[in-house]
């Protein structure tokens, strides 16, 4: 009777892999951890966390970003205005209204002064009250 010794190791080609082999595989295939968290309270964005951890070659990352349409996170018409944008718009509109009111008031005062010096003081006060009524209606 003949005894054949059992072979050690399975059907794998190589029994060990080093750190170099693991890094080569990760860089070739890529490892991407992408997380997006938004916390809103009553429609106001309180916290926004957008994290992307990439361990990959540049080519692998660019293929991933193109596939997910994530090359530029904040671009495009879908970008929601944040709190600084909203505050800035309100400040600009308020300043625009105040400057418009100040300029129209200055122009009105000058025109009243010119009318008052040529026609008398009684007609000037009535036109001034009429213009104030128009301003209040607007």
Swiss-Prot record:
Family matches, as PROSITE patterns: GAS_VESICLE_A_1, GAS_VESICLE_A_2
Source gene? gvpA
Quote the InterPro entries the UniProt record gives: Gas-vesicle_GvpA-like, Gas_vesicle_GvpA, GvpA, GvpA-like_CS
Q: Name one GO cellular component term.
A: vesicle membrane
Family matches, as PANTHER family: GAS VESICLE PROTEIN A1, GAS VESICLE STRUCTURAL PROTEIN 2-RELATED
Q: How does it assemble?
A: The gas vesicle shell is 2 nm thick and consists of a single layer of this protein. It forms helical ribs nearly perpendicular to the long axis of the vesicle.
Supply the NCBIfam families for this chain. Answer: PRK09368.1 (NF006872)
Report further notes: This strain probably produces some gas vesicles from the probable gvpO-gvpA-gvpF-gvpG-gvpJ-gvpL-gvpS-gvpK operon; it can be induced to produce more under certain growth conditions.
Keywords in alphabetical order, please: Gas vesicle
Where does the record place it?
A: Gas vesicle shell
Q: What induces it?
A: Gas vesicle production is induced by growth conditions that promote production of secondary metabolites tiancimycin A and B.
Entry function: Gas vesicles are hollow, gas filled proteinaceous nanostructures found in some microorganisms. During planktonic growth they allow positioning of the organism at a favorable depth for light or nutrient acquisition. GvpA forms the protein shell. It is not clear what function gas vesicles perform in soil bacteria.
Task: Please name the GO terms that the record assigns under molecular function.
Answer: structural molecule activity
Q: Which Cys-Cys disulphide bridges does the record give? A: none
Q: Where is the composition biased (Low complexity)?
A: 116-129
Q: Which organism is it from?
A: Streptomyces sp. (strain CB03234)
Q: What is its main location?
A: other
Question: Looking at the record, which segments are called Disordered?
Answer: 74-138
Q: What is this protein called?
A: Gas vesicle protein A
Q: Which family does it belong to?
A: Belongs to the gas vesicle GvpA family.
């Amino acid at each position: 009777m003949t005894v054949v010794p059992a072979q050690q190791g399975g059907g794998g080609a190589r029994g060990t892999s080093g750190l170099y082999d693991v890094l080569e595989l990760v860089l070739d295939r890529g490892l991407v951890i992408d997380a997006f968290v938004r916390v809103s309270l009553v429609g106001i964005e309180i916290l926004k966390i957008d994290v992307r951890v990439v361990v990959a070659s540049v080519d692998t990352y660019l293929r991933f970003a193109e596939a997910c349409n994530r090359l530029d996170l904040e671009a495009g018409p879908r970008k929601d205005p944040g709190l600084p944008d909203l505050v800035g718009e309100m400040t600009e509109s308020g300043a625009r209204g105040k400057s418009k009111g100040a300029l129209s008031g200055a122009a009105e005062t000058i025109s009243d002064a010119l009318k008052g010096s040529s026609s008398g003081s009684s007609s000037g006060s009535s036109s001034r009250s009429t213009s104030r009524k128009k301003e209040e209606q607007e």
